A protein has these predicted regions:
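Generic surface-pattern signal
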Residues: 22-30, 41-46, 160, 186, ...
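Short, low-complexity, charge-dense intrinsically disordered segments
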Residues: 228, 232-239
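N-terminal intrinsically disordered, cationic/polar leader segments
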Residues: 179, 197, 201-209, 213-227
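Residue-level signal for secondary-structure boundary elements
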Residues: 29-33, 45-49, 141, 163, ...
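Acidic/His-rich, divalent-metal-binding segments that scaffold phosphate/diphosphate chemistry
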Residues: 2-122, 145
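Intrinsically disordered, low-complexity linkers and terminal tails enriched in Pro/Gly
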Residues: 2-3, 225-229
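Divalent metal-dependent catalytic cores for phosphoryl transfer on phosphate-bearing substrates
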Residues: 58, 69, 80-198
Length: 239
């Protein structure tokens, strides 16, 4: 039996998710970026970990296979937004989407349950992936220095703010897009988790630490079901 048999895991087929990831990587037209991404997603030592890893311990996609589900979802968002902003570089944005959380393979432990590794506690995934991706880039002879700097910047800036752990703010178009789309997918993942939980009162979910609020179950609300919450809901914001 797998650990995922006893803990929460993605409802998607991880093999299909991975096949989609390989397809997305192969579609990258920039040869340097495609070689970089494929050096990661086709690495035989990385693949099984990529299929198992969560995207977080508790904030979003915090289940086995969550990282892969998040990356594929984020790539889908990128494609939609790229159609609206055709001036953006699709290869650069997709590269950032695929690699932006790759450090979580080392930051998190996920063999038996989900937690943090010692390295993860000390360094965090941004530092881990910066070093990891930099080494991969340096192993590709002739990789353009300017392109290397853009990829590195997207990794360290994707949290968007200093207080959220990014040492630099996003400073070019694709870096900004990656930050906001990553945040959107993370928030929607947290909303989904809250709505799928059977905890809460009436039309409201239990308090979500990731979202810092309760979420309204709009289907029940629109059907005319009226509920009253305990006074404690008003004190949630003070938690």
């Amino acid at each position: 039996m797998e650990a995922a048999d006893f803990f929460a895991h993605t409802k998607e087929n991880v093999d299909q998710l991975y096949a989609k990831l390989v397809e997305i990587a192969a579609a990258i037209r920039n040869p340097w970026l495609r070689q970089l991404v494929e050096s990661v997603v086709l690495d035989a030592e990385i693949v099984p970990r990529l299929k198992r890893a969560p995207a977080a311990k508790s904030m979003h996609h915090a289940f086995f296979g969550g990282l892969l589900e998040h990356v594929i979802s984020l790539c889908g968002l990128c494609r939609v937004v790229l159609s609206h902003y055709p001036e953006a570089d699709p290869d650069l944005l997709i590269t950032g989407a695929i690699l932006h959380d790759i450090g979580k393979l080392e930051e998190l432990s996920y063999e038996r349950s989900i937690g943090y590794t010692d390295e993860g506690q000390l360094l965090g995934h941004i530092m881990i992936e910066y070093e990891f991706v930099t080494k991969r880039i340096d192993s590709i002879e002739g990789f353009p220095a300017a392109l290397k700097a853009l990829v590195q910047h997207m990794l360290i800036a994707h949290h968007g703010k200093y207080e959220f752990g990014s040492p630099k703010l996003p400073m070019f178009r694709e870096a900004l897009m990656l930050h906001y789309l990553d945040d959107l997918d993370s928030k929607m993942g947290a909303v989904r988790a809250a709505l799928e939980s059977d905890k809460g009162e009436g039309n409201w979910t239990a308090y979500s630490g990731a979202l810092e609020r309760r979420i309204l179950r709009t289907d029940g609300f629109l059907s005319g079901t009226k509920t009253e919450l305990e006074p404690q809901m008003n004190s949630d914001k003070h938690r």
